[in-house]
């Protein structure tokens, strides 16, 4: 398919959802390029994100739509959405308010391996999850 034909397809037609109706979305800070998180989107959450310019995902554990920041206030303003060459992965470029990670860090990728076995924290703690979400039982 030539470039002109490819760009004429609608964005939503190009997205290849998996057998569960989901597509992975990598989330990146639009200014720094830092990867903040990975989440899943279904058609409804993707349409909502496109409409509101606020990141909305599909929670597999809760089996419902999840507007990022609805509990914590740590919203993601969406600046751009890119799709990969296969159409099966999205990249959201966002402005992150507060931390992206539910355990309080700026990025969900807040740990790195030191020697292949041990880990160290390599990111900034932005909030105390107990203060934001309450104590989890």
Swiss-Prot record:
Cysteine-cysteine disulfides: none
Ligand binding (Zn(2+)): 85, 101, 108
Gene Ontology terms for molecular function: magnesium ion binding; phosphoribosyl-AMP cyclohydrolase activity; zinc ion binding
GO cellular component: cytoplasm
EC numbers on record: 3.5.4.19
Compartments where found: Cytoplasm
Needed cofactors: Mg(2+); Zn(2+)
Annotated keywords: Amino-acid biosynthesis, Cytoplasm, Histidine biosynthesis, Hydrolase, Magnesium, Metal-binding, Zinc
Cofactor note: Binds 1 Mg(2+) ion per subunit. Binds 1 zinc ion per subunit.
Any Pfam family: PRA-CH
Metabolic or biological pathway: Amino-acid biosynthesis; L-histidine biosynthesis; L-histidine from 5-phospho-alpha-D-ribose 1-diphosphate: step 3/9
Binding site for Mg(2+): 84, 86, 88
Catalytic class of the enzyme: hydrolase
Recorded catalytic activity of this chain's protein: 1-(5-phospho-beta-D-ribosyl)-5'-AMP + H2O = 1-(5-phospho-beta-D-ribosyl)-5-[(5-phospho-beta-D-ribosylamino)methylideneamino]imidazole-4-carboxamide
Domain of life assignment: Bacteria
GO-annotated biological processes: L-histidine biosynthetic process
Keyword Iron recorded: no
Family membership: Belongs to the PRA-CH family.
Its job: Catalyzes the hydrolysis of the adenine ring of phosphoribosyl-AMP.
Subunit structure and binding partners: Homodimer.
Annotated protein name in UniProt: Phosphoribosyl-AMP cyclohydrolase
Species, as recorded: Chlorobaculum tepidum (strain ATCC 49652 / DSM 12025 / NBRC 103806 / TLS)
Biological classification of the source: Bacteria, Pseudomonadati, Chlorobiota, Chlorobiia, Chlorobiales
Gene field: hisI
């Amino acid at each position: 398919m030539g470039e002109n034909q490819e760009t004429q397809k609608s964005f939503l037609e190009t997205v290849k959802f998996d057998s569960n109706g989901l597509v992975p979305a990598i989330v990146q800070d639009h200014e720094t390029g830092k990867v903040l998180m990975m989440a899943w989107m279904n058609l409804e959450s993707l349409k909502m994100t496109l409409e509101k310019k606020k990141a909305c995902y599909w929670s597999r554990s809760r089996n419902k739509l999840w507007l990022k920041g609805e509990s914590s206030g740590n919203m993601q303003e969406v600046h751009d959405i890119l799709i990969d060459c296969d159409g099966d992965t999205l990249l959201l470029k966002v402005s992150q308010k507060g931390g992206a990670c539910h355990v309080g860090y700026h990025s969900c990728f807040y740990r790195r391996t030191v020697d292949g076995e041990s880990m160290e924290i390599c990111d900034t703690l932005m909030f105390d999850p107990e203060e934001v979400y309450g104590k989890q039982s």
